[in-house]
C-alpha cells in the first residue's frame, strides 16, 4: 500500500511541475509541455498540469504507459518503395500514441481521464505544418515494421538488430517513432534520441555501401547564400554535416519514393550542383540549360533503382550515371571508372548486366546499345549500327579506342601528345560539356551530340582549327593536311573540296559483324546521303600502308575507281 501511495505522489509531483529529472533536460522546457507554462505557441489556455496530455495514473486507455490521450483510429496510407524490404503495417505500439496528436485528426486536448482541455488561440488539432504529418505516411520514414536479422540480410545495407545500440532502440523488435524520437527530451532538436549531424542517427540502422568514402559524407562545402537554401529543414551548414539530409527528408518528404527532398529526381542534385554549394566545375544546372543535353528534366518517376541495367523505358536521370552514396574524387585511367562513376550499374563489353561498373563506358551502354528508342546516327551511314558496344569492340576492322588500344599503328604517327598507340579514351574525350572549366561529363553542350568541341558535318564548311576542333584535339592538323604519315588527299578533300571528315569516317567504329578490314579500315563508313554507286559499286579497298582505292560517286565526282 505504501508503495502504491509513493508512486502516486511521484506521479502527481511530476505532472504538476514540481519534479523534473530526465538526464540533463526535462519535458518542462520543450514544446511537449502543452500546459499553460509551456514554451511553445501551441499550449493550453488554463491547464497547468504537464503530463496529463499524454499520461494519467487512473482511468487510462488500456495501452501502456498509462495513456491518457484519445487515439485517432485512422487508417493510414503507408510508405511504399520498390527498394523497401521491410513490410510496414498500420501503426501500432508507441507510434499510435504519437500519431494521436501528430496526424491532425484528434483535438490536442482530448484526454480520457476528464473533460477536453481548451487550447489558447482557438487551436484544436495540430496546426498545419511539418509537425502535422497527417494520415498520409507515404512521405514519412516507415514505422511499425519488424526489424530482424532476416530483414538486415535481405536488404544488405542495414545494421543487424544486435548492432543497434542505445539510445536508438527497437520496440518489441519493431521500428517505431520512439526508435528515433524521445518525447520527453529535446537535446538534439525534433526530440531526436541522438544527433542528426553527419546523419549519425540514420547510420544507427543504415550501413550504405561506399558511404564511408563518399564525397557527400566528407565534403566541407558550404552554401554561398544564393537562394534557394539547399538545406531548409536542417540547422547544418556543410555537405558533410547534412549527409543523408542533403537529399532525403525523413518526414514530409517532397519526393515520396525514397523520401527525397524533391519529387523531380534531378532537383535533389541541382539544389547543390547549381553553383551555390558545388564549385563552378561541378555546376551541372548551367550545363543542363544548354541546347544539347541529357534531358533529366524531361522525365519524372520513370527511373527505378532496381531497374534492369539494359534500360527498356526511355529516360535519363542523374542517378542513371551517378551513385550519390558512392561518388568521390578518385582518379583513374581510361577505361576504368572514376570516383564519380562508382557504384553505378551498367552493361559490360560482353553484353552482361553488372551491378557496379568497372569501366566508364559500361554506363553509356545502358542506353546506347541499339534500344528501339535510340536516336539514329547524326550522319546516315552505308553500314547502319546504333549499338555502340558493337562499334567499339576491339575485334572490329577499325574503332576509336574506348574499350582497348587502337589496332592501327599508322594513326598513332599523327597523334598529339600525350596520345600514343596504346592510348585508351573515355567516351567523355568527345562527349562532354563544352567550355573551359566545365564539368567533365556529358551533361550539356552548345554542340550537337553533346560534343565538347565543334565537329562540322556540313558539306561546304571552310576547314579551320575551329571547325574540326574535336578531331584536331587528338589528331595533328598540320600533319594530316600535309599528308605526312597519313592519307595524302586529306587537304584536297577537306580544304579544297570542303568535304567534312564525317563524309568518309564513322567516329565510333565499324562492327566486325558488318564490315571487313579490307573495306572498313581507318573508320571508313561513307555518308549514305551523299555517296552513291559508281557502276553499281560503293566501295573502299585498303591496299596497304597509306594506299587504297575508292569506287563511288561523291558530290558529283565519279571515283571509278580512284587510287591513291
What are these regions (language model features)?
Residues 1-4:
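Positively charged n-region of N-terminal signal peptides that target proteins for export
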Residues 22-52, 56-564:
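C-type cytochrome heme-c attachment and multiheme electron-transfer modules
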Residues 9-19:
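Bacterial N-terminal signal peptides
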Amino acid at each position: 500500500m505504501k508503495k502504491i501511495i509513493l508512486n502516486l505522489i511521484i506521479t502527481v509531483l511530476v505532472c504538476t511541475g514540481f519534479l523534473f529529472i530526465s538526464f540533463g533536460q526535462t519535458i518542462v522546457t520543450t514544446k511537449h509541455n502543452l500546459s499553460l507554462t509551456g514554451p511553445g505557441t501551441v499550449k493550453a489556455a488554463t491547464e497547468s498540469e504537464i503530463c496529463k496530455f499524454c499520461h494519467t495514473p487512473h482511468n487510462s486507455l488500456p495501452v501502456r504507459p498509462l495513456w491518457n490521450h484519445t487515439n485517432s483510429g485512422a487508417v493510414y496510407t503507408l510508405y511504399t518503395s520498390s527498394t523497401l524490404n521491410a513490410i510496414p503495417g498500420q501503426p501500432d505500439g508507441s507510434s499510435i500514441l504519437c500519431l494521436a496528436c501528430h496526424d491532425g485528426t484528434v483535438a490536442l486536448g482530448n484526454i480520457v481521464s476528464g473533460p477536453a482541455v481548451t487550447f489558447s488561440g482557438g487551436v484544436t488539432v495540430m496546426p498545419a505544418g511539418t509537425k502535422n504529418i497527417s494520415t498520409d505516411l507515404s512521405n514519412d520514414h516507415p514505422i511499425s515494421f519488424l526489424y530482424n536479422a532476416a530483414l538486415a540480410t535481405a536488404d544488405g545495407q542495414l545494421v543487424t538488430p544486435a548492432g543497434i545500440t542505445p539510445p536508438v532502440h527497437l520496440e518489441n523488435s519493431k521500428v517505431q517513432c520512439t526508435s528515433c524520437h524521445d518525447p520527453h527530451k529535446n537535446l538534439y532538436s525534433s526530440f531526436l534520441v541522438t544527433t542528426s549531424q553527419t546523419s549519425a542517427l540514420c547510420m544507427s540502422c543504415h550501413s550504405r555501401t561506399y558511404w564511408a568514402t563518399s564525397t557527400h559524407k566528407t565534403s566541407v562545402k558550404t552554401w554561398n547564400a544564393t537562394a534557394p537554401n539547399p538545406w531548409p529543414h536542417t540547422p547544418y551548414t556543410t555537405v558533410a554535416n547534412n549527409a543523408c539530409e542533403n537529399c532525403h527528408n525523413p518526414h514530409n518528404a517532397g519526393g515520396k519514393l525514397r523520401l527525397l527532398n524533391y519529387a523531380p529526381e534531378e532537383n535533389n542534385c541541382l539544389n547543390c550542383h547549381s553553383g551555390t554549394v558545388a564549385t563552378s566545375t561541378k555546376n551541372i544546372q548551367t550545363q543542363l540549360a544548354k541546347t544539347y543535353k541529357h534531358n533529366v528534366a524531361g522525365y519524372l518517376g520513370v527511373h527505378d533503382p532496381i531497374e534492369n541495367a539494359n534500360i527498356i523505358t526511355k529516360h535519363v536521370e542523374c542517378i542513371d550515371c551517378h551513385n550519390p552514396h558512392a561518388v568521390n574524387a578518385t582518379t583513374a585511367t581510361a577505361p576504368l571508372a572514376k570516383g564519380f562513376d562508382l557504384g553505378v550499374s551498367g552493361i559490360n563489353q560482353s553484353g552482361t548486366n553488372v551491378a557496379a561498373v568497372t569501366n566508364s563506358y559500361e554506363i553509356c551502354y545502358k542506353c546506347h546499345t541499339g534500344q528501339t528508342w535510340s536516336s539514329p546516327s547524326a550522319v546516315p551511314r552505308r553500314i547502319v549500327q546504333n549499338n555502340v558496344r558493337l562499334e567499339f569492340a576491339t575485334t572490329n576492322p577499325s574503332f576509336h579506342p574506348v574499350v582497348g588500344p587502337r589496332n592501327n599503328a599508322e594513326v598513332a604517327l599523327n597523334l598529339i601528345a600525350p596520345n600514343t598507340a596504346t592510348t585508351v579514351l573515355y567516351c567523355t574525350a568527345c562527349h562532354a560539356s563544352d567550355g573551359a572549366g566545365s564539368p567533365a561529363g556529358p551533361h550539356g553542350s552548345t554542340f550537337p551530340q553533346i560534343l565538347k568541341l565543334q565537329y562540322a558535318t556540313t558539306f561546304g564548311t571552310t576547314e579551320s582549327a575551329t571547325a574540326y576542333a574535336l578531331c584536331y584535339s587528338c589528331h595533328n592538323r598540320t600533319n594530316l593536311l600535309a599528308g605526312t604519315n597519313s592519307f595524302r588527299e586529306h587537304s584536297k578533300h577537306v580544304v579544297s573540296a570542303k568535304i567534312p571528315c564525317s563524309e568518309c569516317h564513322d567516329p565510333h567504329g565499324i562492327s566486325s559483324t558488318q564490315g571487313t578490314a579490307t573495306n572498313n579500315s581507318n573508320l571508313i563508313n561513307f555518308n549514305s546521303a551523299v555517296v552513291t554507286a559508281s557502276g553499281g559499286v560503293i566501295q573502299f579497298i585498303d591496299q596497304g600502308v597509306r594506299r587504297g582505292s575508292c569506287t563511288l560517286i561523291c558530290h558529283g565526282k565519279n571515283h571509278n575507281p580512284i587510287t591513291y
